[in-house]
């Protein structure tokens, strides 16, 4: 039987008009939280990076709030076999 570990990559877009900020945060299987924004400016860049580390995307979800400005939160759920 295969045992898995799980992680979460969160992309947050916050903006109003021409001003916006995009950040990426990695929630590791050990409970750690790390800002990984400097590793790339697109979700694809981040997913390819962790894919090379053995992570597989298993689900994605998006929340959008346009009440005051614009906020988008994308959650990428990943897994990989425990070694």
What are these regions (language model features)?
Residues 1-83:
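Terminus-proximal functional modules
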């Amino acid at each position: 039987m295969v045992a898995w570990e799980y992680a979460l990559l969160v992309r947050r877009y916050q903006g109003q008009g021409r001003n916006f900020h995009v950040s990426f945060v990695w929630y590791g299987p050990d409970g750690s939280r790390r800002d990984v924004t400097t590793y790339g400016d697109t979700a694809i860049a981040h997913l390819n990076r962790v894919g090379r580390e053995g992570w597989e995307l298993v689900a994605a979800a998006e929340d959008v709030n346009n009440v005051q400005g614009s906020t988008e939160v994308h959650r990428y759920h990943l897994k990989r076999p425990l070694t």
